[in-house]
Every structure is written in structure tokens, then in C-alpha cells.
């Protein structure tokens, strides 16, 4: 499950997209462990 509302749309990992509101850690390395939603870096 995903904590909070996910706002990052940079994820390109399909499995992560399906399981965690289109949000995943950099590199999509943690998809298998469950995505961790994070706020997008303020630019």
C-alpha cells in the first residue's frame, strides 16, 4: 500500500506503477519490496 498521496510521476517501472500510485524510489530498485511514495523535489 502507499502512504499518503503520491505526486511523483517520474517512475518508469511498470510493476511499481501498478502497485504504488505511479510512484517509486529512484531507479525503481525497491519495487519488489514495495514502493515508497515521496514528495517530488521542489524545483
From Swiss-Prot:
The keyword Metal-binding applies. InterPro entries: Metalthion_dom_sf (IPR017854), Metalthion_dom_sf_vert (IPR023587), Metalthion_vert (IPR000006). Keywords: Metal-binding, Metal-thiolate cluster. This is Metallothionein B. GO terms for cellular component: cytoplasm; nucleus. Metallothioneins have a high content of cysteine residues that bind various heavy metals. A divalent metal cation 4 binds at residues 20-21, 31, 35. Residues 1-16 are annotated as: Beta. One of its GO terms (biological process) is cellular response to zinc ion. Disulfide bonds: none annotated. A divalent metal cation 1 binds at residues 8, 11. A divalent metal cation 6 binds at residues 24, 28, 31. Pfam families: Metallothio (PF00131). A divalent metal cation 5 binds at residues 21, 23-24, 37. GO terms for molecular function: metal ion binding. A divalent metal cation 7 binds at residue 37. Belongs to the metallothionein superfamily. Type 1 family. A divalent metal cation 3 binds at residues 2, 6, 11, 16. Class I metallothioneins contain 2 metal-binding domains: four divalent ions are chelated within cluster A of the alpha domain and are coordinated via cysteinyl thiolate bridges to 11 cysteine ligands. Cluster B, the corresponding region within the beta domain, can ligate three divalent ions to 9 cysteines.
